[in-house]
Each structure stands twice: as structure tokens, then as C-alpha cells.
Amino acid sequence: MKREKGRRGKKRICNFCVDKAEVVDYKDVQRLKKYITERGKILPRRISGNCAKHQRLLTTAIKRARNIALLPFTAE
């Protein structure tokens, strides 16, 4: 059997780079919710399309928001 080659999806553009955002605000809950699954997990870079720098900042912001109870740790 031949093995099919994997599909390459469309290259996604980092939304934070487009907006020229220097920081990711942990208080901006509506924006952070876009990068969390319905189970409460943080979306990976290959799915969200963020660059490495902003993915790191986003992860830190989500964890801060969880610690001060702005975002849930798990699904509701």
C-alpha cells in the first residue's frame, strides 16, 4: 500500500503581528477565549496560527487569567 503524503494547510497569519501588538493583555478575556478549546485547553501554534513569540505571550496571559479566575481551568 502506498502511503499518502500529508496535506499542508493554508499558512495562517499571526493576529497579534497583524495588529502590531507588543503585549498580550491577560484582562482581555474575549480575545483570549478565541485561543482556548471548549475543553479549556490552549490551542497549539499550528492550529491558532500565532508566531512563536506571541504564542508564548498568549500562553502566559491565559495562565495568568486562569489564576485570577477570569478564565476557567476546565470546561464549564
Curated annotation (Swiss-Prot):
The keyword Transmembrane does not apply. It comes from Pelotomaculum thermopropionicum (strain DSM 13744 / JCM 10971 / SI). Binds as a heterodimer with protein bS6 to the central domain of the 16S rRNA, where it helps stabilize the platform of the 30S subunit. GO terms for cellular component: cytosolic small ribosomal subunit. The gene is rpsR. InterPro entries: Ribosomal_bS18, Ribosomal_bS18_CS, Ribosomal_bS18_sf. It comes from the Bacteria. GO terms for molecular function: small ribosomal subunit rRNA binding; structural constituent of ribosome. This is Small ribosomal subunit protein bS18. Keywords: Ribonucleoprotein, Ribosomal protein, RNA-binding, rRNA-binding. Part of the 30S ribosomal subunit. Forms a tight heterodimer with protein bS6. Belongs to the bacterial ribosomal protein bS18 family.
